[in-house]
């Protein structure tokens, strides 16, 4: 089964780092990229997206707002909010929309638990 992972971050370097970690952990999964929330919506309209990794702090729209919209359209999609801004309020908002929280700087070790859970959810259908 081909799995498409959408990496949303306004930092090209952060997208590259996420891609490296993703490739190390799930080499068969395909990476799609978006540099903004608007670009992410465009990608979602054109491509099948199975998993989303979304930066919290983006210029025109925060990642939690984007994640909430994705959750409405895709109730079982594994979604992770990635941020260096570790505040209880952000973690609580992520949990409200059933999104995981992954701390920056993103590492393979930090992403491993989320991707393992995502793989299980995709195999079991939700």
Outline where the language-model segments fall.
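Two-component/phosphorelay signaling modules centered on CheY-like receiver
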Residues: 12-32
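Acidic, metal-coordinating helix/loop segments flanking the phosphotransfer/catalytic sites
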Residues: 33-51
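Acidic catalytic/metal-coordinating carboxylates
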Residues: 36, 62-66
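Conserved phosphotransfer cores of two-component systems
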Residues: 45-47, 69-76, 97
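Active-site residues of response regulator receiver
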Residues: 55, 83
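The feature encodes the CheY-like receiver
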Residues: 59
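Alpha4 helix (beta4-alpha4-beta5 surface) of REC/receiver domains from two-component response regulators
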Residues: 65, 86-102, 113
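Receiver (REC) domain switch/active-site region of two-component response regulators
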Residues: 107, 116
């Amino acid at each position: 089964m081909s799995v498409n992972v959408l990496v949303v971050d306004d930092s090209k370097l952060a997208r590259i780092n996420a891609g490296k970690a993703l490739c190390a952990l799930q080499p068969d999964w395909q990476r799609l990229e978006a540099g903004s929330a608007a670009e992410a919506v465009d990608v979602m309209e054109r491509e099948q997206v199975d998993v989303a990794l979304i930066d919290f702090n983006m210029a025109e729209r925060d990642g939690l707002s984007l994640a909430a919209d994705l959750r409405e359209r895709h109730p079982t999609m594994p979604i992770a909010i990635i941020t260096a801004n570790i505040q209880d309020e952000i973690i609580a908002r992520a949990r409200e929309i059933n999104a995981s929280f992954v701390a920056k700087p993103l590492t393979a070790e930090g992403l491993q638990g989320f991707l393992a859970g995502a793989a299980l959810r995709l195999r079991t259908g939700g």
